[in-house]
Design a protein with these regions (language model features):
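Membrane-embedded alpha-helical bundles that constitute the cytochrome b-like, heme-associated redox core
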Residues: 1-222, 226-252, 267, 272, ...
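Generic structural hydrophobic/aromatic packing signal, biased to beta-strands
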Residues: 31, 62, 136, 167, ...
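Aromatic- and Gly/Pro-enriched helix-to-coil junctions and flexible linker segments
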Residues: 74, 81, 94, 101, ...
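Pore-lining and gate-forming transmembrane alpha-helices of multi-pass membrane transport proteins
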Residues: 181-186, 252-264, 284, 288-289
Length: 409
């Protein structure tokens, strides 16, 4: 069992690596085509149906790009489709969600201080919210709201705020922000998979058959692509947020997430305008800085259970498994002596305001809850505690290893 813990952690690391790589490819391609589209310049010498061109230089070579409003008069034999960057990002993200927040849900997904849920119930809420969210958004885009893009965007923002609040009522702070990111990314990838790509195939098929494509497909793609454009930066923030307790360790984390979506709008508006006109509106940076100042202030408002509340809380079945294992008392004392100066509700380490990654190791319930992470980081490896903070000897690490293995025999 203990070997499986190490293997499982490496699987999670590998999938996370894949997710970051594919996300870089997707976001890079998305930003490139948005910038390219906005920088296109008209030219009377262009072929019929072409709306603009752009010359670029990169890596010692020159590139000449021509955009057609619908399509060229004759389709080329080879056509590159930009879709798998999006698909693999979502698929790897979904796999990572399952590995960390479903399989490891007793620790990372559920917060017993908020609601009393079985793990399977949390997983159903996790998966169901992503599915229902897409269906609701898709229905809105297919309604008359599509004729008023600004109103549609505002309603999308309202949905994101509601989901942010809802996730924070059920899940841990880390899981709440991660799920909001997954919710948003699901909308973005589903836009590509269910709308943009199928409609593009219809256009290509019409052209090959000699038919004039319906302009409505371009309109649909523009609405969905615009949403994806403004949602990209907040999704990246939400991907990174689980590494920074200041973003999720407060009762106002759902408001922080909402404000991050607004910063995504202001930043993208600047670059969209700059690519189109050559000069971006500088006021957007002032608004962005103001929003980040508000976010920083909100992050200082502490929340969560107190030390007394944590002591009084009844252990979950998962925690009881480790708290009742042989060697727990020695392991608990070892963790308290080596880790709790930082991993406390009020850390005593100089200039530390929050426990690293939000991991609290003060009570017996805390230590039992994070048993697997303690085993991996302070038992079989020397990742924790930092050597410049405290020197943890091999005997202390052996105590942790023996306790964890005893609980899993």
């Amino acid at each position: 069992m203990y070997d499986l813990a190490i293997l499982w952690d490496w699987i999670a690391f590998s999938v996370r690596w894949l997710h970051v790589i594919t996300a870089m490819a997707w976001i890079g391609a998305s930003f490139y085509f948005i910038a390219l589209d906005l920088m296109l310049k008209p030219n009377d010498a262009l072929p019929k149906g072409a709306s603009g061109e752009e010359w670029e230089v990169h890596g010692g070579g020159f590139y000449h790009t021509v955009k057609y409003l619908v399509a060229p008069s004759e389709m080329p034999e080879h056509l590159t489709w930009h879709k798998w960057q999006s698909y693999t990002t979502w698929l790897s993200g979904a796999a990572l969600l399952m590995i960390i927040y479903w399989v490891g849900g007793e620790l990372f997904l559920l917060d017993p201080t908020k609601v009393d849920l079985a793990l399977w119930q949390g997983i159903v809420i996790s998966a169901g919210s992503l599915t229902i969210g897409w269906l609701l958004y898709d229905a809105m885009c297919k309604s008359r709201l599509a004729d008023t893009p600004t109103l549609l965007m505002l309603l999308l923002f309202a949905i994101l705020v509601i989901m942010s609040w809802g996730y924070n009522q059920i899940f841990t702070g880390r899981a709440a922000l991660l799920h909001l990111g997954a919710f948003t990314a699901t909308i973005m990838t589903a836009n590509v998979f269910f709308q943009i790509m199928p409609n593009q195939r219809i256009v290509v098929a019409d052209l090959k058959a000699g038919r004039t494509p319906d302009a409505k497909y371009g309109k649909i793609a523009k609405v969905r692509s615009t949403h994806n454009n403004y949602l990209t930066l907040p999704v990246v923030f939400l991907m990174l947020a689980n590494h920074y307790p200041l973003s999720f360790g407060t009762q106002y984390s759902w408001i922080i997430a909402a404000l991050i979506f607004l910063t995504g709008v202001t930043i993208r508006h600047y670059f969209n305008t700059m690519h189109k006109t050559g000069k971006g509106p500088h006021w957007t940076w002032g608004v962005t800085v103001l929003l980040m100042i508000i976010i920083a202030w909100l992050s200082t408002q502490r929340s969560g259970d107190t030390y007394e509340d944590a002591l009084a809380r009844e252990l979950t079945a998962y925690e009881e498994r480790y708290a009742s294992a042989a060697g727990f008392e020695d392991a608990y004392n070892t963790v308290i002596g080596n880790c709790s100066m930082c991993h406390a509700r009020e850390p005593v380490w100089n200039n530390m305001q929050w426990a690293p990654k939000g991991v609290l190791l003060e009570t017996e319930g805390d230590v039992a809850r994070y048993a697997r992470q303690i085993y991996l980081h302070a038992g079989v490896s020397r990742a924790m505690p930092p050597p410049n903070a405290i020197q943890m000897d091999s005997e202390a690490r052996a105590i942790i290893i023996a306790w964890y293995r005893a609980a899993n025999d």
